[in-house]
Each structure stands twice: as C-alpha cells, then as structure tokens.
C-alpha cells in the first residue's frame, strides 16, 4: 500500500516588514494544523518565529519548490515580483497576499489570512496563466543579454543630464524616433504598473496584447501603442549617444551601450497565479485605486 505524500506549500515573505512576520506566523500555524507541510528559505527563517516542523532550504533556486503545490508570497509588489521569478522557473502557482500599497498581483489582503489558509487547505482556488515577455539585447549583431518580465521591460536613460535617443520598431518596421526618458514595453499585467505611471492605458488581463509606452518623450508623436501579442517590439539606442539601461520588472538591470538593440516578444513561459474568487478585474481596479463610483445605478432590469 503506497503512503500518501504530504502536501507542501512554499512560503516567501518580506521579513523586513513586521506585518509580514506576523502574517507568516499565522499562515504557518494554520497550514501545519491542517497537516500541510511548509517550506521556507533558511535566510528568511532566521527572522521568522517558526516552529521546528517547518522545512528549511538553504539555496534560493527553482528546485527548492520541487514537490510544492503552491507558493504563498507575503509582501508588497517587489516581493510579489520576486515570487513571480520562482513561480515562472518552477511552474508552481503563486498566491500573493498584499502587505504593501496597491498590490495588483496579490489575490488577498492581510485581513484575509484565515480565508487564505482555509482555501489552500481545501484546494478551493483556481489557477490562471499570465502572459510574460522574453527580452533579448543585441550589440553589433550579437546577443549579449537575455531576460524576461511579467510586468515590463523598461529601456531608460542611464543619467539625468541628457535624453535617451531611440528609434522604435514594430514587426521589423521603424515607427518613430525621439529623445525621451525611456520606453516601457509592457504586458497587460504590467499595464497597471510602470506603464500606467507613464500614461499608458489599462489593459484587462484577459486581453492579449503588448504595450509600448514612451516616458516623457520630446516629440509630437509619442503616444502609447498597443500591438498584437504576437508582434515583436524593438527599441534601438542610437549610436554616438549616452548609454541607456534596461530594467526588467524593476528588479534586474543591464547597461545598454550606444547602438544596443532591445527586442521584446511574447514570453515562452507564463507565470501561474492562484485565484481565490471570481471578482472581475473592473471591481479589482476600482478597489485598488479607490476609484469614485458613487452615483452609479447600473443597467435597468
């Protein structure tokens, strides 16, 4: 007779936040009480009041999630994007609990922790896939860097003194060129992040598209562009101008020398997110940005 394998959840927390420490303690106790194993990074465990039953792993690699059914992330947007790196590399769904400000990637708030534990215990969640982008940097015809992003790849000026001089390209054809502070190349998920701050449109997650949003461009035609999800977007840094810098999800960066070319296309590997309820993205948008909807009556019945 084969023995049933113990269910295991990986917990990732921003241990610099007192709220994360308290939240982690509640989640761990609730899961262990239900007979679900919990795995935590050793470096984070030092800052958390964890019982001895918690499994500790020393190295932060995708393999540390082997055998886990879920990745629970406690923190703000930065911690959630860190969790997304683990989720993408391992294929394990991520369930985010927001301890920061907006937290569009999060599925629950700190006050919902009891519900989160209950839903995980009963497997009462669904998994959806979010589109990513793959990023390639070329220099003199050679590939010099590859990366990916869940929210956006941002090409920005490296210094404050001068504008970044670029030419934009879509599907192998030039579109326009100008001096700017940068260009945000975004997914629909990222449309409520940096692209939103740069004046880009909000795109519902179920809409498949790529966005190209200029940042403070010195040009008459500098509007946000929305393309097919199968388009290839490119930004070329002009030769003989100051260098730029590439940021992926605001976490990973590489310098872009003059003449560098950044290509962005639909990612081969999505990020899987665990969802606890069927709230529409419209309701999520209203709640996250505290949008005024008083006076709304709705369609007549």
Curated annotation (Swiss-Prot):
The active site is at 77 (proton acceptor). Its EC number is 2.7.1.23. It is found in: Cytoplasm. Gene3D superfamilies: Probable inorganic polyphosphate/atp-NAD kinase, domain 1, Probable inorganic polyphosphate/atp-NAD kinase, domain 2. GO terms for biological process: NAD metabolic process; NADP biosynthetic process. It catalyses: NAD(+) + ATP = ADP + NADP(+) + H(+). Keywords: ATP-binding, Cytoplasm, Kinase, NAD, NADP, Nucleotide-binding, Transferase. Its main location: cytoplasm. GO terms for cellular component: cytoplasm. GO terms for molecular function: ATP binding; metal ion binding; NAD binding; NAD+ kinase activity. InterPro entries: ATP-NAD_kinase_N (IPR017438), ATP-NAD_kinase_PpnK-typ_C (IPR017437), NAD/diacylglycerol_kinase_sf (IPR016064), NADK (IPR002504). NAD(+) binds at residues 77-78, 82, 151-152, 162, 181, 192-197. It is an enzyme of class 2 (transferase). It comes from the Bacteria. Its cofactor is a divalent metal cation. PANTHER family: NAD KINASE. Belongs to the NAD kinase family. Involved in the regulation of the intracellular balance of NAD and NADP, and is a key enzyme in the biosynthesis of NADP. Catalyzes specifically the phosphorylation on 2'-hydroxyl of the adenosine moiety of NAD to yield NADP. This is NAD kinase 2. It comes from Streptomyces coelicolor (strain ATCC BAA-471 / A3(2) / M145). The gene is nadK2.
């Amino acid at each position: 007779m084969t023995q049933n394998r113990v269910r295991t959840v990986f917990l990732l927390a921003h241990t610099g936040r007192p709220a994360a420490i308290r939240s982690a303690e509640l989640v761990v106790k609730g899961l262990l009480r239900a007979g679900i194993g919990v795995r935590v990074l050793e470096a984070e465990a030092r800052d958390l009041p964890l019982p001895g039953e918690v499994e500790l792993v020393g190295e932060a690699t995708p393999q540390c999630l082997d055998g886990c059914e879920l990745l629970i992330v406690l923190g703000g947007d930065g911690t959630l994007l860190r969790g997304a790196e683990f989720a993408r590399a391992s294929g394990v769904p991520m369930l985010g609990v927001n301890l920061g400000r907006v937290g569009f990637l999060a599925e629950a708030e700190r006050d919902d922790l009891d519900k989160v534990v209950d839903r995980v215990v009963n497997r009462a969640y669904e998994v959806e896939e979010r589109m990513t982008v793959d990023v390639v940097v070329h220099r003199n015809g050679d590939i010099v860097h590859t990366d990916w992003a869940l929210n956006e790849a941002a090409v920005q000026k490296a210094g404050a003194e001068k504008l970044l001089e670029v030419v934009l390209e879509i599907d192998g054809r030039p579109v326009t060129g100008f001096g700017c502070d940068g260009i945000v190349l975004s997914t629909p998920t990222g449309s409520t992040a940096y692209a939103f701050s740069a004046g880009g449109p909000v795109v519902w997650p179920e809409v498949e598209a790529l966005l190209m949003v200029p940042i403070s461009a010195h040009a008459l035609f500098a509007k946000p562009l929305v393309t097919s999800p199968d388009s290839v977007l490119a930004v070329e840094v002009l030769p003989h101008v100051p260098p730029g810098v590439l940021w992926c999800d605001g976490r990973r960066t590489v310098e872009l020398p003059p003449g560098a070319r950044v290509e962005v296309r639909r990612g081969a590997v999505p990020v899987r997110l665990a969802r606890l309820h069927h709230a529409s993205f419209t309701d999520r948008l209203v709640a996250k940005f505290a949008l005024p909807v008083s006076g709304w009556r709705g369609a007549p019945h």
